[in-house]
Amino acid sequence: MPTSRLTLFWIMLCLLLGVNLWQASVTELIYDEAYYWYFSQQLAWGYFDHPPMMAWMIALGRLLFSGTLGVRIVGVLFSAATYLLVWDMISGVKKNHYVPEFFLWVFSMTLLNAYGFLILPDTPLLFFTALFLWGVQRLLKKNSWSYAFWVGTAMAAMMYSKYHALVVILGVVIGYWPLVRMTKAWVAVLWALLLYTPHLYWLYTHDFVSIGYHLSERPNQPYRFDTFTLGYFINVFAQFGFTLPWVVYAWYKTPKGRFNTVLKSLVFFVLTFFFISSFTKRIQTQWIVVIAIPTAVLVWELYLRDTKIRRKLLVSAAITTLVLVYARFGLVHESLLPIRYETHGNLAWTSRLKASVGDSPVVFLDSYRNAPMYAFYQGGSSYSLNTMGYRKNQYSIDGSYEQIRGKKVALVAPKNHVFWQTNAPEFSFEKAVDDTYHGLWIDRFTYYDQIKASLVQVDSDQAIVELVHPYSYPINAQHIFLSLGVIDDYKRVQQQIPWSLSGQRLPVVWKAQDTLRLVLNKPELLSREISGIRLGVGSFDLPAGLQGDPQKRTTWNP
C-alpha cells in the first residue's frame, strides 16, 4: 500500500475509533450491558446465560476507565481491530484506491456499527469471527502449524464469547469440506477444545445450567408467521439496510476461489440455520450478525471488480449511514427519537429510587435488568428475586442473596405486578412516563431460592414432593409454603395454585443439606388436563420462585 493510502486508512480508522470512544462514554448503558457489567463483579469461567468473555473484557476496561467508557472500551478496541482484519482479508489489488468508500460501506452495516460502541456478546464474537476467518484464509494459502494454532485459538475465543460461535464453525467446515481432510485443521479443533476445557468444566460443575436453559428451559411462544418467519427476513434487512440488494448480488456474483467459497458457505449456512429455526422460535436480530464479516469481504471484493454496482452500493450505503448517524445521536438525546430507548433516563430513575431508599439494599421483583442497572449507577447492593412467572438468571446461581440475607431491604416492582394485589406499597417512584414502581420495606429479608423442589411420585389423589435444603445453615421450614405452577406447551406459567402443607410436620430447625419428603393431597382447583407443572417455594409473604424445574405432564394422574 502506498504511504499516502496507508496513512489515509489509519487516519480514518482512528477517526472511527475516536467517534466510537466518544459515543461509548456519553451513551447510557442498555440493560443487557448493565447485566454483563454485573457478571464482571465476580469473575468466573462461565455465567448463567453466557460464556465469560464479556465479563473479562469489562473487568479489563474497568482497570483503565470508570463509568460507561470503562465498561465498553475493550469492545470499542475490538471493533476497530475487526475493521482492520476485514480490510486485510480483501485481496483485490485496487482496494488501496477506495479507502473512504470502504469505511462508508462497513459503517453502513447496522449491527457492525452498533457493536462499535456497545458491549454485548456479539461484540467479541464479531472480532474473533474475523480473526478466525483471517486465520482460515492464511491456513488455506500456507498450510502451516502456526496458522493452525491461530485458528484453534480463535475458535476457542469465539466459543468463550457466545455459544452461537458453533454455528460459525460448522458453517465453515460443512461449507468447505476439504478442511476435513487437513490434518492441521483437526489439530486446530483439538487445540480449541483444550483451551475451552475450563468453561466445559465450569458447565459440568454447574449442572450444565447454561445449556439446559437455552435448549430446554427457556420459555417460548406459539408460532406466528409475522413475528417468527417474517420477522427473520425483517432482521436480515435490518442487518444491511438499503444496501441489501447489492449484498445479495455479491453473495452470488463474487469471483470463485477457495476462501470466497468458505465465506459464501458460511453466509448460506447461517441464514439457512436460522431460517429453519424461525419455524420454532423468534429469531433475534443479533443472532445472524456474524454474516456481517464474510459479507463485508465479499461485497468489497465485488465492488473492486464490478464498476456497475459501485455508485449504487455507495448511494445505498450513504443513505443507511445517514439514518444510523441520526439514530446514534438519538441514543444520547432522547428528544431526537420518537420512542424511548434503553439508553434514556437510567441515571435519572435510579437516582429517584436512591432518594427513596438511601443506602439500603434494593430487591427487584422479576428483573435481572433493573437490579444491575441500579447497582451500576448508584452503587450498593441489589438483587433480582425471580418468581415462578419469571425466569432464572445469574442471580439464581451466584450466591448474591447471602450479601443481603437478614438485612433491611427495599423491595420494588412495577405497579401492575401481581405482588401488589395482596401487599400495600409504602413508597413509589417514576421509572419513566406512565411507568410507576411501588416499593415496601422488609426488616429482615429471608428468601430460599436455592431450595430444590421436585415431584417424585404421583397417585390419583396424592403426590410425594421432595425439598432439598442446600444451605450451610439451618432454616425454619415452618416459614415456607409450596405453590404448583401449571405451564403450557411453551413452559409459560398459566396458573399458580397454593399447595397446602397442612398436616405436614415441618421442622422449626431444618438442618443444612437435609431433605424433606412430603406426602401431599392433590391441589384444589387443578384440572385433569394439563401440559406440565413447575414447583415453587415461597417464604413469609414473598411469592413462590423457580425452585422446581418444568416437568411435562398431560394429566395429574400417573
How would you label these PLM feature ranges?
Residues 24-36, 45-57, 65-69, 207-209, ...:
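Extracytoplasmic catalytic/substrate-binding loops of multi-pass membrane glycan-assembly enzymes
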Residues 92-96, 132-147:
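Membrane-interface transmembrane helices that cradle and orient dolichyl/undecaprenyl
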Residues 102-110, 155:
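Short helix- or helix-capping micro-motifs
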Residues 42, 114, 138, 145-162, ...:
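Membrane-interface alpha helices of multi-pass inner-membrane proteins
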